[in-house]
């Protein structure tokens, strides 16, 4: 729960990349005398750091200085080859905007002080500067922020042109994978509320840190789950320092994922902690309904989840229409009503009307303990209609690729239930199961780090 005092990474990022977002925003503000002095001093530091060239000989040294006191390990490429068996295809987990991800295992003999453990090794594709910036941002944030609901960054490699990140391995993969895989066992109500509470706690920690952080890319595929379904936020490539002093927001280029980004952020580029609250409301709505934030396979009026479901969230008589049918009625009605009301508030078009994350965490903490869940055994059959056919992990005639670290190879899910487990009919032995198909492990949930507003599950880019 403790956070190590952050050295300011802002000057480091600016030195590395020229930070066009921040520079553009600051140019719009009235220049005060003190501002000019500070900027001159800042630019003197930039010329020293000057990490705009990813192959800079001083990059590794600058990072080591900036992250002094952190417990990050700086791996060599040779060590990573040992950990991943030379990046063997048998250890391949997936590939996304950052590049391929491999599972690995750190032996306790690799180096003193590093315990034996499974890891996920993400290799960055450095063809574009954008990727380097996200890699650097992730190292800086996760190197200094420590919390049980943030994924642990164990270390990194910055050797010649190679850029890698080494994370703790998350055996349950992402919430996106657990919630939307067609043939996976349905997440029970209690587990969904546990995940929502954990993810909300992670956001609260970021917003209330000594130097507040705006996550900016909160979505189901960025919520990773350990073996006990503890939620941990991952992928800090788009994270930003919160507003400073009397500023009410951060002005920045619009980036994120369609269906999750707050409407005022899309319209104005003004980013606040309440922008994250809106995104949380979308994920909470996904947990309630079992639907994606954007689903082009549905009818036109139901493709955007928020537009379709939000009007019904505040009406108890209509709530049952939007609840995930795979829950088969086994959820707390009182808890569902309170969760729906919370989602409604988080999704307000007026940022000031959204609750802060501490209030969200408090409400969800109570919801975890509701035990008025109906008992009984049910069978839910997936309708075999054209609208519900799985797309076999393909977009057009091309197979999708799996998201990077978010989609670790999945273990068989045995979800804990607070009531007898309903039986879900399995596909016939002759049917092709997406779980076992190669394409299923190569889905791309991020359409590239260079997209201003990335699409999710087939959504349109802005």
Swiss-Prot record:
Residue list for modification O-UMP-threonine: 252
Cellular component per GO, a single term: plasma membrane
Stated name of the protein: Serine/threonine-protein kinase RIPK
Residues bearing PTM O-UMP-serine: 251
Alphabetical keyword list: ATP-binding, Cell membrane, Hypersensitive response elicitation, Kinase, Membrane, Nucleotide-binding, Phosphoprotein, Plant defense, Serine/threonine-protein kinase, Transferase
Binding site for ATP: 93-101, 122
Originating species: Arabidopsis thaliana
InterPro entries, per database record: Kinase-like_dom_sf (IPR011009), Plant_Ser_Thr_Prot_Kinase (IPR050823), Prot_kinase_dom (IPR000719), Ser-Thr/Tyr_kinase_cat_dom (IPR001245), Ser/Thr_kinase_AS (IPR008271)
Superkingdom of this protein's organism: Eukaryota
Region (Disordered): 378-462
Induction behaviour: Induced by the microbe-associated molecular pattern (MAMP) flagellin (flg22). Induced by the Pseudomonas syringae effectors AvrB and AvrRpm1. Induced by 12-oxo-phytodienoic acid (OPDA). Down-regulated by UV-B.
Active site as annotated: 217
Catalytic activity line of the entry: L-seryl-[protein] + ATP = O-phospho-L-seryl-[protein] + ADP + H(+); L-threonyl-[protein] + ATP = O-phospho-L-threonyl-[protein] + ADP + H(+)
SUPFAM superfamilies: Protein kinase-like (PK-like)
Gene for this chain: RIPK
Basic residues bias (residue ranges): 397-409
